[in-house]
């Protein structure tokens, strides 16, 4: 593996070394101690376990003329059943993404009646439990990352490190995600049962709030020094990560581009958007089972501050796209 790579509990890994010369001998070491099974050019780890396999691996290559020791490779096994809140993991992939582990937990989703900018009945406060931790992109998906998977860039505001925009929910779910997951599975970068997906609205808001109960993750007010919104930046996107991160370590959860999530928006019997949930407790909510429009979260470079609130939601048709909408990926285990 490479520095910054990710290996999950239960995966296998082959460490290998290339050397020139005749009659070579190999001795793999972990933390400077010889490994009895490590006497060839490759060393295999099966069923990776943090308690057994975490460590600094190196190999000594020798023959009658002398020996040389390679520099070490630090191997850290991620136990996906443990809490790694706030830690960033670089996932070796074509898309070159950084992910943050979001641990399981509970939070108050929605907004209180008196919150400034509140939209109304589609934000009824209710307790939500996220029972399974998941990875979420540290940043919005960039144009460079999108290009690395699909070989194209639909964005209006061209810059490799700006968020990709002009992508519909269908573009993400019918094209980008299937290809990315196939690439990652083929390259052995995903453990069995794990896939890149869009987060649910509840997962997105949980990660956005990062323990906060205020209108925004950083308090009850917002300014142009905290986010790109309301035309303060010429109604265009900014480089991802241009503003401060939240407590969990996520950037641009407020502003820049609105972000697709997986949920349908709920309509009442009068075809008016309304909150799908009552004030009753919810566990891993998925939203309505069908609908017409999908939810977007976070507000954008051209939206006013009320759309940037953690609880706020907007919605668009599955095929809708413009330069105000992008996305952020989750990495989750199928249940």
Model-based region annotation:
Residues 49-58:
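Solvent-exposed loop/turn motifs of extracellular immunoglobulin-like beta-sandwich domains
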Residues 1-4:
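Surface-exposed, proline-enriched loop/turn segments that connect beta strands in immunoglobulin-like
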Residues 11-18:
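A short beta-strand segment in extracellular, disulfide-stabilized domains
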Residues 30-47, 158-159:
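Surface-exposed, flexible coil segments in extracellular/virion-facing regions
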Residues 92-155, 167-170, 255, 329:
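A short glycine-rich, aromatic-capped structural motif
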Residues 108, 113, 117, 158, ...:
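Functional-site microenvironments in short loops/helix caps that host divalent-cation chemistry
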Residues 20-27:
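Solvent-exposed loop segments of extracellular immunoglobulin-like
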């Amino acid at each position: 593996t490479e520095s910054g790579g990710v290996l999950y509990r239960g995966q296998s890994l082959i460490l290998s070394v290339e050397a020139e010369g005749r009659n070579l001998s190999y001795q793999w070491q972990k933390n400077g101690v010889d490994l009895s099974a490590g006497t060839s050019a490759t060393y295999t780890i099966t069923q990776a376990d943090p308690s057994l396999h975490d460590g600094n691996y190196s190999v000594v290559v020798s023959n009658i003329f002398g020996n040389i020791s390679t520099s070490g490779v630090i191997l850290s096994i991620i136990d996906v059943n443990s809490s790694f809140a706030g830690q960033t993991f670089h996932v070796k992939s074509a898309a070159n993404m950084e992910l943050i582990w979001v641990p399981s937990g509970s939070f108050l989703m929605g907004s209180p009646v008196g919150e400034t900018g509140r939209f109304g009945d589609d934000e009824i406060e209710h307790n939500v439990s996220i029972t399974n931790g998941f990875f979420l992109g540290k940043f919005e998906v960039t144009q460079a990352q999108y290009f690395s998977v699909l070989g194209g860039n639909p964005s209006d505001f061209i810059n490799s490190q700006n968020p990709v925009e002009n992508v519909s929910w269908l573009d993400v779910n019918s094209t980008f995600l299937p290809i990315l997951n196939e690439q990652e599975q083929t390259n052995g970068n995903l453990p069995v049962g794990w896939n890149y997906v869009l987060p649910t609205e509840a997962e997105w808001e949980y990660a956005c709030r990062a323990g906060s109960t205020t209108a925004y993750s950083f308090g009850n007010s917002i300014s142009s020094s905290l986010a790109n919104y309301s035309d303060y930046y010429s109604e265009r996107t900014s480089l991802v990560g241009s503003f401060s991160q939240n407590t969990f370590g996520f950037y641009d959860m407020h502003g820049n581009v609105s972000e697709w999530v997986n949920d349908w928006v709920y309509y009442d019997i009068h075809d008016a958007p309304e909150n799908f949930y009552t004030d009753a407790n919810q566990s891993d909510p998925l939203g309505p089972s069908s609908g017409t429009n999908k939810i977007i979260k976070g507000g954008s470079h051209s939206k006013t501050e009320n759309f940037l609130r953690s609880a706020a939601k907007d919605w668009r048709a599955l095929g809708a796209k413009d330069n105000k909408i992008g996305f952020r990926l989750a990495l989750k285990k199928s249940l």
